[in-house]
Amino acid sequence: MPIMAGTASPWRREAVFLTAMLVVETSVVGISTLFKFATSKGLNIYPFLGYSYLLASLLLLPSLFFTNRSSSLPPLSVSILSKIGLLGFLGSMYVITGYIGIEYSSPTLASAINNITPALTFILAIIFRMEKVSFKERSSLAKLMGTILSLIGALVVIFYHGPRVFLASSPPYVNFRQFSPPLSSSNSDWLIGGALLTMQGIFVSVSFILQAHIMSVYPAAFRVSFLYTVCVSIVTSTIGLVVEKNNPSVWIIHFDITLITIVTMAIVTSVYYVIHSWTVRHKGPLYLAIFKPLSILIAVVMGAIFLNDSLYLGCLIGGILITLGFYAVMWGKANEEKDQLSFSEKEKTPLLLNRKNDQV
């Protein structure tokens, strides 16, 4: 690609990265919205996940022949395969809890809860002693305060609806029931959905920690992604066969919204991994994270257009708190990495001076 060869102007390079991130966030929210709509037409979650990840793995398969062919890679040992298998199991749990949570609630709630992942990762990193909290450092305080804000925001989104801030009118081409919970029997569904989406966040956080470990010992992003999607397809299909053992007809896919949703999910999943790896390589993980809160706004717009979703005050307040907490955690992580870099440079300076003195 010429744009990445260093010949293009900086603003064009930034435009490419910006467009890629907007495509990723819109696609991820879009598939959640499409899934929510398809469930009303009879889509079952287990065939949806099993077939989608199987097709995604087939789409990722060609990348294995063009990437990670370096001889410096360690052999794909049983230990590494078992860790990727565990990652696939965690991934299966997070997509199952996530999409069932969307069935009970809405893509807007899913997007809001998804943004507490950095806070949950920070908490788990402290529990596993991968992070240390120092009240004397601004970065630690920022991550701590951001975590608290994110968790408060999540509680507000789940437990407080409040009045409607925006009332969506049903589009003429969508004959669909109101998804935002009225203050009646649907409140319990909203709470169940929020609990499942929070569980999804925990699974994602543990997956991030395990994925970072796997990539440190086996830095082959596309190969790991391929094996991961295969594992998720196997695990979700196996669980589905057990859960739906008395209903085998759910595995028959018809040429309707069900097939469209499965194919779209597979394409989004495979493209997401490609753009994710490409962006992290060229811009770093922080750049990728900056765009996550946009998913809340995108979900609100898509929900209003396609699902007749209304926006409640609780979701608005909680979304703002989660976004502030998200950026506080990201700011703390960025400053922590900056401090570590400057500290390592200071350590190198005396060594260089000593070498010069020895040469003299």
UniProtKB/Swiss-Prot annotation:
Give its localization: Membrane
Q: Which SUPFAM superfamilies match?
A: Multidrug resistance efflux transporter EmrE (SSF103481)
Record keywords, A-Z:
Membrane, Transmembrane, Transmembrane helix
According to Swiss-Prot or TrEMBL, what is its membrane topology?
A: Multi-pass membrane protein
Pfam family, any one: EamA
Q: Where is the EamA domain?
A: 30-158
Q: Does the keyword Membrane apply?
A: yes
Q: Can you quote a single GO CC term?
A: membrane
GO molecular-function terms, A-Z: transmembrane transporter activity
Regions that span the bilayer: 15-35, 45-65, 84-104, 108-128, 140-160, 190-210, 224-244, 248-268, 286-306, 311-331
Instruction: Say where the protein is mainly found.
Output: membrane
For this chain, the family text in UniProt reads:
Belongs to the drug/metabolite transporter (DMT) superfamily. Plant drug/metabolite exporter (P-DME) (TC 2.A.7.4) family.
Question: What is the protein name stated in its UniProt record?
Answer: WAT1-related protein At3g28070
Species whose genome carries this gene: Arabidopsis thaliana
